Each structure stands twice: as structure tokens, then as C-alpha cells.
Amino acid sequence: MSVDSLPNQADPPPEDTKGRRNRHLGLALVLITTAQLMVVLDASIVNIAMPHIQDDLGFSDANITWIITAYTIAFGGLLLLGGRMGDVIGRRKVFMFGVTVFAIASLFAGLAQSEWELLTARALQGLGAAAASPTALALITTNFPAGRPRNRAFAVYAAMSGAGAAIGLILGGSLTEASWRWTMLINVPIGIAVALAAPKLLSESEPQPGRWDLPGAITATLGLVSIVYGFNHKGQVANHDTGALYSWTDFWTLAPIIVGVGLLVAFVVLEKVTPHALLPLRIVTDRTRAVSFLAMLIVPAAMFAMFLYVSLFIQDVLGYGPLKAGFAFLPFSAGIMVSAQIASNLASRVDPRWIAGAGGVLASFGLWGYTNLDLDSSYVTDLLPWIIIQSLGMGLLFVPLTLTAVAGVDQRDSGVGSAVLNTMQQVGGSLGIAVLGTIFANGIADRMAELTSGAAQAGTPPTEEQMALFGLVSQTAGTVDAFNVAMWLLIAGTVITFLGLNIKHEALSADGQVPDGGETDADDESKSVTV
């Protein structure tokens, strides 16, 4: 007999039940996006704090970048394993494990008294992030009904992923004013609160029976770690007198990349014959999903380059302090959140490729604006308009790419599918910093050589003031060169996205249907209980 047929005067009106459910979903979304924001911004929050960390803990110039690298290598290398753990064990369990490890590691990082203590804690933060991030995205599928509620949740998630780096710069500048240690310790109460609230607000996924694919886990993890290490090494300064980066032929750049590619090839071969694969190849063989993954490799490469080089330009050329430089990115965070909401509202009415295409055009136009920077540029007239334009474009890009990457993924695979998306974003960011860092350094070196050669031909050695001016002119030239390449990189990603996405907006509509015909836990909650 159906419970709905039993008289019960205490039953709340349907609108009250709906209101409570909406509030519950709202709190669940706050929990998920808070965890994702915490994970994403931690890659950038230390950027402004690094000089203070260097002075306090005695980092050498050669080792200081490992504060970021230790985190990104562990994060990027373990994402696939973290996503699969969520599918097999339960996404909520792995999510709680991830944020707990992240919080504990943040405490150790904030209390670190030496280089190795901090770097070990940063690697542990990456491990926690690799468990929390893919399961956070997969928990949206588990907890939100398909259609408009899920699209909106994905939009907020995408906005947090895109704006996290900018928010990290703002927080980094603010917290560093007190102490660099607060850039780590701020995560502790947030992580603990998220872990404690998760059982009350998030539904658990159905664990998927199966054995662990240990050979696949080992080859994929080592392959990704090797590639991320190689790209990160390429982006580091080899000669601090000239500012030159390591070359692509440097052993510790080239060898890890080659080894990593070889391990990933072996991983694909293993996954074809393994009954319980870490990454079922059906996830990446779908055309639309593959295009979304590829675009997520390219788009962050351009975005993270903007954060790095605009931040350097604002501080070195415009003379902004850490706090002011951080707040200079506040319009980017606001813009990407606004456009992400617009993209969410359009997702059920407009084909994703048109939304992403418009976003790519806007973001590319924003990057073009940075190519006109010079020593006479100001923030308000020469940076702010392009920051806003690029942020609006990025929001329109991230939402459809996130939606199409997870649309139609079977419930049992949504954790690892989310992990692939996060992996592409993480590796793409490392790739962008490495490739565009080379362009940036070469642009500086070429312009400096040109200026010093001209001074030598004039027969008078440049003064100290002239050399300082030459440095700013050269840095600006390198910045412009890097943004030229970033613009064309993003244009290529936009074209690939527009031509490759092959999914209609009906698949993302608010009709309550999951594209693959599966059901979510959130769908189950809306059904009548029978006895």
C-alpha cells in the first residue's frame, strides 16, 4: 500500500516539502562548491605569499616554486585514482576523506618550520584535493535531479573552478598582510566544517562492486605525475641572473614527459583488456565528451597564463602592492560568476556549442586586449575592460564544457568521468605555464638584448636607472608575446569546441531525464515511498 494513501494530518503541504527540499539542495551545493573552491584556490593563494615564505623558511630561489609544484603534481597525478575510489567505495565517503586529509595537511603546512615540512604538507594537500575534487563534481550528479537544478549546480561548480584562482590571489594578498601561515590555516576550519556537514546534506552514491585495477592505477598515476612534473620543471627558472627557463631538451623536462607518455600508452593498453578498468574507455571514446576533455586541456592553459602575467604586470610595472594586486582580480571573479549563471539559464534552450563558441570569442577578445599593454598603460583603462570581457567569456565556456563532459556518463562511472575532466584542467594549467613561460622568457631576453645592444652602439653604458627601465620594457614585451600565443591557443580551443560538440540542448533540458536513462539518488527522493 502506498504511504501517500494513508491519512496524516501532520503531513506538510506540498509547497513546504518542496521548499525544504530546495533549501536542502541549496545547502548541499554550498558544501560541494566550498570544497571545490578551497581545492582550486589553494594552487594560487600562495603566489603572493611566496616571498614571505621564502624569507621565513629560507627557501632558495631554485626551490621556492616547489611550494606550488608539490601541490599540483600530487593533485594532477592522483585525480583519476581519487575519482575511481569514489565510484567503488562511495563518493561521499571519499569526499569526506579528501577534505579531512586536506584540512589536516593545511594545519601541518601552516605550522611548518622547514622547507621539507612545508613541501610534504603541500603534497598531502594535493592528495586530499585529488580525492575531494572529482567526487565533489560527481556528487552533483548523485544529489541533484537532471535538468534545470543540475544545470544550475554545474554552473555554480564551473564558476567556482574558474574563479577559484582569482579568489586565491585576493585571499592570498589579504591573508599575507597578517602572516603567510594564514594562507594555509584558513583551510582547517573550512575543511572540518565541510567534512562534518557532508553526512547530513549529501546523499551517498551506490558503491560499485569490483576489484581494484592496481596496474592501471599505478601506470596512470605515475604517468600523470611524470608529465605534470616535466611541464612544471619546464616552467621553472634555470638562471636567476638572466631569468631564462629550463629548455625543452633539459633532461628533467624531457625525460619525465617521455616516460609519462609511455606509461599512459601502457595504461590505455591495460584498460582495453582489464575487466574492472580504472578508466573504462567508453568514457573517452564518445565524440562530444572527448572534445570537452580536449577543450578543458586548452582553455585553462590560456586562463592561468592570464593570472600569472597580469599579476606580474600589475605588481612590477604598475607598482601595486600584494593586497591591491589581489583585489585587482575581483572583477574577474564577479564576471565569471555572472556569465556562468547566464550559461546555465541558456543550457536548456541553446545548443552548448553556441554558448561555448560565444564564450570563446569573448575570452579571445579579452586576451587580444592584453597584447596592447605598454609602460603607459593603466589598470582602469587598459586592463579592467579586458579582464571583464575575458571573465564573461570564460564563464560561458566552462559551463557547457562541464555539462557536456558529464552528460550521459553512466552513474557507476561518474566519479572517474569527473576525475578526467579535473585532470585535463590541471594538466592544461601546467602545460600553459610551461609553454607560455618559454614565450615570455624569450620575449624578455630578445627585447633586453636589443635595448642593451642599442646602448652599447651609442658608446655609453646604460645607467642603473636605464637598466631598470630596460627591464620593465622587456618584461612588457614578453607579456605581450605570451598573450599573443595564449590568444591563438584559445581561438584553436574555441574552434575545436564549436566544431566537435555534438549534443543538443534537449539532452540538457529540464525534463528530469538523465541522458543515458539512469536515475539519480535525487530522483529517487521525489518518488512516493511504498510499504
Protein language model annotation of sequence segments:
Residues 1-34, 266-269, 276, 288, ...:
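Transmembrane-helix exit segments and adjacent C-terminal regions of multi-pass membrane proteins
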Residues 2-200, 343, 350, 371:
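Transmembrane-helix bundle of Major Facilitator Superfamily
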Residues 23-74, 241-416, 528-531:
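Transmembrane core module of solute transporters
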Residues 37, 73, 107-108, 123, ...:
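Hydrophobic residues within the alpha-helical transmembrane core of Major Facilitator Superfamily
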Residues 85, 89-99, 113-120, 132-155, ...:
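C-terminal module of multi-pass small-molecule transporters
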Residues 163-178, 225, 229, 427-447:
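A gly/Pro-rich, aromatic-decorated transmembrane alpha-helix motif that marks the paired
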Residues 176-295, 320, 483, 487, ...:
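Hydrophobic transmembrane-helix bundles of small-molecule transporters
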Residues 207-211, 242, 276-282, 407, ...:
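Short, Lys/Arg-enriched, Gly/Pro-containing loop segments at transmembrane-helix junctions
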